[in-house]
Amino acid sequence: METVQFKDWVEDAATMLVEHCDGPTVLVGSSMGGWISLLLASRREFKDQIKGLVLVAPALNFFRPHYHQMAKELNLEQQATLERGEVVAVEDEWGVTYLRKSFVEASAELELDLSQPLEVSVPCRILHGVRDASVPYRNSVELMETLVGTNVELVVRKKAEHRFSERKSLEVLAQSLEDVIRDI
């Protein structure tokens, strides 16, 4: 807990690709998994392997704004604990979130610059719900505009939330995966 960093999660995913995925691969990533999928798809070493993406409510560059929002809501003792570099556990909608300043600072090096074209050109479907309280769906609009690929589609569902897990959303997810597989 004290030493794990976001880059470790990214490297774990890269290791899975190298060790367990032979041939063309379509990555399906939800929330931070969408961010990780984009980071991997933008790496030169995976250009020949990753052939498609399906991203559900991708939480790009999520940690800093989320951390600062949560830190504002802490009491003074908890804020001082964070400033000393220690971990603070906070109950939230996902269960317990562990806040650590060094984790957030280190994750900044993996943030994607959406003011520049993002060099990912594989078929990509981005799915997002308007009712997503964790990641605004407008972030996915910005991502779609940034990707250099031309086979990119964004599906925004008015009644869907962050998990995109209601029956109709799951049908859209399955169809999107089929579309990407067909297009590669």
Feature-to-residue mapping (PLM):
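Catalytic nucleophile-loop/oxyanion-hole region of alpha/beta-hydrolase
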Residues: M1-C21
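A generic local structural motif
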Residues: A14-T15, L38-L40, E109-S115
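Primarily recognizes the serine-hydrolase "nucleophile elbow" in alpha/beta-hydrolase
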Residues: M16-L74
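The alpha/beta-hydrolase serine catalytic core
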Residues: D48-R125, G129-T146, T150-V156, E161-I184
